[in-house]
UniProtKB/Swiss-Prot annotation:
Pfam families, per the entry: PCRF, RF-1
Keyword Transcription on entry: no
GO cellular component, one term: cytoplasm
Gene Ontology molecular functions: translation release factor activity, codon specific
Protein name: Peptide chain release factor 1
Superkingdom of the organism of origin: Bacteria
UniProt feature coiled coil, ranges: none
Amino acid sequence: MEIKVLECLKRLEEVEKQISDPNIFSNPKEYSSLSKEHARLSEIKNAHESLVATKKILQDDKLALSTEKDPEIVAMLEEGVLVGEEAVERLSKQLENLLIPPDPDDDLSVIMELRAGTGGDEAALFVGDCVRMYHLYAASKGWQCEVLSASESDLGGYKEYVMGISGASVKRFLQYEAGTHRVQRVPETETQGRVHTSAVTVAVLPEPAEDDEEVFIDEKDLRIDTFRSSGAGGQHVNVTDSAVRITHIPSGVVVTCQDERSQHKNKAKAMRVLKARIRDAEVQKRAQEASAMRSAQVGSGDRSERIRTYNFPQNRVTDHRIGLTLYNLDRVMEGELDMITTALVTHVHRQLFGHEETA
């Protein structure tokens, strides 16, 4: 890992020289790229300095502990060593994660689709809980969220919820949320106190950049229908034909949007989702053809694959793909997802590039 850090520090010096060149401002695209790289490398530098300083303090405490005789000071030093070892482990993992080579698509916005699966009303309620969890996580990362479509259930929660999320490294941290999320808990309507199991399916679709030439949709291939939007239970919320349904005839992909009162806005949102789904279908097709890469993925990313279990009675969350079990489900549901998403990103990196690169 030290070799990687030294390479990054050397590159940071080069980037700083390039950014300080007044001529760089004549090329906004290059300046933007260098600025992002500078921010990433600076974060690595700061993390490395924190790790080195913490290791030094730990080393000093251990040295003092080896010669100290006073029981009170010994106890204090032992506590310091324990805290120091935990800090070194945490900072090492943080630095290791920062050293993961960035994917060109890491900063792509994503469209996240959550749907109630088995479990009826309880599944719909858990969709609502997951929506809240992802909104809190996004807020903690400084990301922006936008509701694209929402279909409420009769008892609260959502039958389906589609949102766009944008910001730095959105795709990197959210791409492995795709799959089936299983929940085990006692529903509020359960009078016997029995634990019920229900499920929510999640799809994460990277949103194509505006200049992405891979996604081309011919207007001739689209069928666009308009109709009156309606709320939960079929109650009309708009007397005009503002809702939009777009069908991509070649692929059969259908997208409906009725959240906005403007037909134009609903069409724009539906087109965003349509493009993301078509792009995702192409990516999935290529991934299936590249069998070597598939073996290194954290699961298939298929929404039918059970990836995680949320057990509320035990306050336990388990990610089945990497065998990670945590007993702080309450914190996870409050948006503290980094402990899971970071572990997944690190696992994939080790699988693809080998542990020796970051060890």
